[in-house]
């Protein structure tokens, strides 16, 4: 299936629903296999707060309403205002390892950067960011992977823990709003009534946490691997930092952090002549579209000077295009700017690194990236 077919699929939300459950209840994070959920896992999930399909797992018009409510906080103008804060976080992270001869790029920089930023945007304690990371990793896996029984238990515990963390904070923001996205969502109104119920807020918070860290972490990691393997491009970006945004866009096309998502066929149909039964799971492969030679000439070549033409699908396509795309772009740009500004003599420690891809069907990143460097003087 090529670029054009995936465009048609992504735009046709009536035929291909983003809700992988047929009822109104929200995602259970139990993986994408059809195996029944075991009783002990169901018992754990029984302690979670009820949720409904929201934002990413909702279809228009519900999706449209939810997206409108968060779009102001994630608009290009609002995101640009975060630049000093993001730059400060980047410099603080570099300060923590700059005296060493090497760095674990993911654990010491690419993971804490977006998790810290998301914590600040939501208005929750930075000290809890590694807990968010733990919950997020499990719940992302529950959204996009096939899970073992034990992994389902772990994911179920994460769902319950996340709900237990945020439900009292939602109630607190209803009484005492503060200047953050959580308060903005909790207290949003339509015709004088609360715009979002707790059942809607919880999955939206889930998605902001999940998408807000995983995509950016892998975008930074995947991009740095490109530079470590291409010293000429690394040198060019040091000399011409204005080219960094083009490099980020090409990483999103060439090695997209999210390779695909899922849709459920609501009726019988066909894609490129292949029959699709009602209820079937359909996978829009964004990575396949990004490497379609009819859309991108010589797609296997990493080229930041690629002529403008087709839009890459590194953030998806259509109504469910990633709401946090501008934030991820900004975080990645500032991350590369500060790394190249503060450090030099980069090299990859291949023996210490683990360049196997993370164990995920849909997410694309590296397991461990150990990078040698020198501090700029």
Language-model segment annotations:
Residues 1-377:
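Cytochrome P450
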